[in-house]
Amino acid sequence: RDYYASRGLGDVYKRQDVFIATDDERIAEACRTYGMEYCMTSPDHDTPTGRIWEVSTKVEADLYLQIMGDEPLINVKAFDLILPDTLPEDPYYVAVLTNRMEHPADVIDFSNQKVVTNAAREILMISRSPIPYPKGTLNFEYEKVTGIQLYSRRALAFYHETPKSILEKAEENDMMRFVENGHKVHAIVSPYKTVSVDTPKDLALVSEILKGKE
């Protein structure tokens, strides 16, 4: 798993101004091997967003693009979908890329965090349950959140200063802290599929895909 995560980091690092946030010396060593910049963070963070907040206190920027290290299949073309051409007016700007789900088994898989939005593509709810429930119609495309997320500096400060919300605790999703407190989270559909390595099954799938690229 470490090998494939390192490969993913190597691909991402072709972009400019990239820092690897970690509390693990093994990852820091991989960064040194690849010649990457990294930021050592506290081991006490229990969420990735909390770790990125710490980075924002050390690295000055207007926006922080968070790329989860457990999604090594990320296509760098996806970054252009989430990075705005100009700075957003909302000082608490938060956005996430989503993937449409094509298989019923994926919809009921609790490791896939499903998302529903309003007409403006602002998130209403993120759940591990299959939402919405198709009682009245099946004419609906299910989506899941990915590990590509964008935060303004003030949004990260808000996250750090605000206690965990009820639904955030229940679903174990960081972005619900913003939603429950009235801040918009923009969902942007990406055609570039990602796979989060959460289970041995996921690891086997990703390993086969990456071996096919060698």
What is each residue range found by the language model?
Residues 140-214:
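Conserved alpha/beta core of the MobA/IspD/sugar-nucleotide pyrophosphorylase nucleotidyltransferase superfamily
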Residues 15, 61, 89-92, 183:
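Short, high-confidence coil segments that cap the C-terminus of an alpha-helix
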Residues 11-23:
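Short beta-strand/loop segment that forms part of the nucleotide-sugar
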Residues 1-13:
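Single conserved hydrophobic/aromatic residue that forms the stacking wall/gate
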